[in-house]
């Protein structure tokens, strides 16, 4: 459910981006609705609204949601301020790479890999499996960041389509693969305490 909520601002961004640009009169002022810049404004506004509602209901946001929101505000604001979509193109790569750094850092900070801290309450797995799973997420985030960067600056005509649906597709494929991998170890009741690699 959380993933679908996080997807709402991106979906609204996509809808506005695909809308044929046209002039809209608001309080006597003329604005252009449709295209990359009004879509960016929609992304910022909808992100603040969605995560604001989540914060009010839950009294907190997950660290990943804070990172997504801050990145949206920073890169979105720079895009509008300098009237250049280049800043927005860097948002997905930077966010993905920061996630990769966080997952990688958890191997050296704390007693458990980050993926175990996230999913450990629901699954009991050997420490070696948690380590492999965490490394898989690091590789996934690095790949997603590189793929987003490559498409954004090489295939500009459909980088928004890839940003919205390509990233979602890669995530779903990865999650299916993760599920298949985990299904082989779900009956292993070895305590999930950290241990050194052989």
Curated annotation (Swiss-Prot):
Superkingdom assignment: Bacteria
Family statement: Belongs to the YciB family.
InterPro entries in the cross-refs: YciB
UniProt KW Membrane keyword: yes
Membrane-spanning parts: 36-56, 67-87, 90-110, 133-153, 162-182
Region forming the signal peptide: none
Protein name (record): Inner membrane-spanning protein YciB
Functional note: Plays a role in cell envelope biogenesis, maintenance of cell envelope integrity and membrane homeostasis.
Entry GO terms, CC: plasma membrane
Entry keyword set: Cell inner membrane, Cell membrane, Membrane, Transmembrane, Transmembrane helix
């Amino acid at each position: 459910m959380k993933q679908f909520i996080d997807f709402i601002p991106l979906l609204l961004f996509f809808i506005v981006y695909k809308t044929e640009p046209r002039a809209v009169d608001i309080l006597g002022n003329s604005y252009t609705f449709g295209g990359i810049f009004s879509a960016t404004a929609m992304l910022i506004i909808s992100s603040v609204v969605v995560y604001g509602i989540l914060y009010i209901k839950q009294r907190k946001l997950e660290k990943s949601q804070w990172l997504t929101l801050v990145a949206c505000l920073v890169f979105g604001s720079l895009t509008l301020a300098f009237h250049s979509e280049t800043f927005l193109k860097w948002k997905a790569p930077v966010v993905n790479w920061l996630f990769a750094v966080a997952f990688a850092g958890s191997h050296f900070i704390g007693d458990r890999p980050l993926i175990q801290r996230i999913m450990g309450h629901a699954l009991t797995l050997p420490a070696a499996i948690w380590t492999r799973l965490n490394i898989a997420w690091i590789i996934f985030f690095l790949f997603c960041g590189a793929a987003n960067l490559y498409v954004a600056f090489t295939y500009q005509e459909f980088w928004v389509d890839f940003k919205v649906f390509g990233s979602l597709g890669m995530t779903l494929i990865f999650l299916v693969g993760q599920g298949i991998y985990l299904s082989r170890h779900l009956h292993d009741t070895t305590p999930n305490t950290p241990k050194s690699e052989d």
